[in-house]
Amino acid sequence: MIHKELENIRRNYKLKSLDTKDVDLNPFAQFNIWFEEMLKSNLIEPTAVILATASKQGKPSARTLLLKSYDETGFVFYSNYESKKGNELAENNNASLLFYWPELERQIRIEGKVEKVTQKESEKYFKTRPFKSKVVHGHQINQRLLTAG
């Protein structure tokens, strides 16, 4: 069934326009300005970002995850290396991030190559995880060990 009324749903965006004279030439500096603005707006899930990956056959896949940090070297998120996204990134490390902040009438798209953080950084992050998350992750590791032999 086609919903014809969807064609008529349209919102007028009036908060801000994107004018090149108002944008910092350094994309990381501009992202930081917008990110700080977003944090002040008290969004429900301020660090939510959509990660889009593709298999080596080019089949796309997208999911929402949480940004853990960013600086001029890149944007950091964590994932199980053996998850679908982990496997896709291992065979094709090209990906994109999409921040969508409808309350601010803004979205930011970032494209690039994904690389693993150091083992030390990964372990440091794992220690900050809630207990239940650590248990689930440990269970996944044990499952892999049991099925690997």
Q: Where in the sequence are the language-model features?
A:
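Binding-site signature for planar aromatic cofactors or substrates
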Residues: 1-149
